[in-house]
Amino acid sequence: MYHDFESHTITRRSFLKGAGAVGAAGLLAACGGSSSSTAASASSASSGAAASGKGLSELFTYETSGREIESWNMLYSQQAIDFNVTTNIIDGLISFDNYGKPVPALAKSWEHNEDSTVWTFHLRDDVDWVDMNGEVQDHLTSKDFLVGFEWVLNAKKNQAANTSMPSTTVVGAADYYDKTYGMDDAAGEALTYEDMLAAGVGIDAPDDYTIVYTCINPCPYFDTVASYVCCYPAPPALVEKLGVEGFRGVDYTQQWCCGPYLIEEFVADNSKRFIPNPHYYAADECNRFERVSLSMITDLTVGYQLYQNRELDELELSESTLTTITSDTSNAYNDQLCEKRPTKYAYDFHFNFYCLNSDGTPNENWNKAVANRAFRRCFQEGLNLIPYYARFNKINPLKCENNYYTMKGVCYNSKGTDYVDLVAKELGIDGEKYDGETMVHLRKSTADSIAALKKQAMDELTAIGVTFPVKAPFFFVAGDTVAQDNATVLKQCFTDSFGDDFIQLELGTYVSSLAKEVRIPKLHGFVINGWGADFGDPVNFVGQEILHDSNAYYAVNYSNIQLVAEDPADYQKELVDEFEQFTDLVNAANAIVDDTDARYEAFAKAEAYMINNSLAVPCYYDVRWCLTHVNEYTKINAMFGPCNFKYVNWETSEDAYTTAQYEEFAKAFDAAKS
């Protein structure tokens, strides 16, 4: 059910009237952390300009249609649309500050041995599980982490979700998963954490407030693994109460919480309301809102109306709204336009190599075309996406250009070199810099070279019966005018780059769930999807595209290359061979465990191979302009983990921030970061 936003019968102030208030605590840099160094970091991000007016006690924010939460189980979900909600009700061992540095959460401290093979986490002793009514249900101890870890590794309970990280890092984890995978459902579901320990999995709880993980090999980045949901706790009593199917599909009314907020109200596809957890362990160590009200909106145009009525406190701007504001010098919002930081996600074209028609028959024309390397290289070498980038950042569109599969800032070698700079060197673009005018991958392309590549693809494909133009099924959520306009502009980019005789986007819509309505039925020709790191190592990105791994998220769920590899047609054998070579390169890089620099160099070669063969094609970074009463530079900003949408320690202002203030915020943030 959608709220009729046009009527505005429920105003911001009338909604607030009579609402219960829960006092907010003092400001520190990160909930759960109280060190003076992190507190200083938090304040430094905003010291460049004073906030105008007092801060907000209640926050009104939004999510767009088609991005409704699908799972309330953090151990089971692998989607940002879920974590953006559940991170506010359940905490993990580690959180992050506004610079992306690890800070304490459920673990008050941690350390590792000399070679980083044994990691010990010391838990707080003041954490309780509460239900959605705020009533204490149980006390959190190390046993909860044993139960949670067994759940993740048990194929009959968690169905392979989130197993790739522990399986490749923790002793015995992969073997335990394989053991449970081979069992019948009843036998697997009956196993407990004690069976996991008996099987030799490298996790131990020497006392009620200590958890120890033993790694297969030296793992200097394991703290970033431990920050992810694969290492989150599960309350034993709740798991026992709900049973396996019940806990896997737990809803918000059943869930127990140990995070900063509770869900006061949830109306699917309409709204959510968060209120402070009255028993939150870090209540005196961070600041929270008295209430967070999140509305599902059909598109950003509706969001702009809500922002103008002060029914939203922050809003990313669509291209059309940004144009409306900037084209009118008298517009009141002209001096309030704020450019945001890039999100943690690197967006890519993810091809579907096993596309089906709506009747379940193979889409042979697309499948043949996309298996052809020259066809895919046209996406890489000939597609001018600047008009598409302008849909996200009209003022500085090329700030959105992405040339890598892995997100910037995920990891650095011993010399402080960003991993993606190593990839750039392998690709031969390390000398290319942002110029605000030309896409990097088009600088070496000419009209003749693009035409030659197009001709090569058409000749090779015509020879195996492909008809032109090739129709590429591409879907967006119905009713979202911004998404529709984005898709329309993307379609025009293909026309402008290649003409209409080669590739044409065949636009389609889904009602509410891309997964259920498009991805699972395999209807997409390609999707543009973003991946954010779960932990700080390149394998977490490129490992999602490999063969022979049931945990490779994109290979299993989007490209369907693993299905193709089982019985490839003649026209798919070269494609499968390319994926096999890529998989070998990734596995070889992942086997280097005693030399981080060599490991990253090997991964860079693997990633460059993937990009050069266009097995997936880098597309964009999300760099938006916004109107806001929230200082983005005080939000959690980690390149990995699920914590970035946690509503804690946000600096806000009753008056909207200005462009000048945000420029000062950025300068202060960068100065403090360096």
Residue map of PLM features:
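Aromatic- and charge-enriched surface segment that lines or borders ligand/interaction sites
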Residues: 108-172, 212, 303-306, 365-371, ...
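Alpha-helical secondary-structure segments
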Residues: 141-147, 208-214, 260, 289-291, ...
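N-terminal secretory signal peptides
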Residues: 1-10, 18-30
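Detector for C-terminal structural segments
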Residues: 21, 28, 378-424, 478, ...
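N-terminal lobe/hinge region of extracytoplasmic solute-binding protein
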Residues: 61-114, 256-257
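Gly/Pro-rich hinge or "lid" segments in bacterial periplasmic/extracellular proteins
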Residues: 185-190, 197-200, 206-209, 214-293, ...
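Ligand-site clamp/hinge motif
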Residues: 244-252, 279-328
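Ligand/substrate-recognition segments at binding pockets and active sites
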Residues: 268, 396-397, 433-533, 578, ...
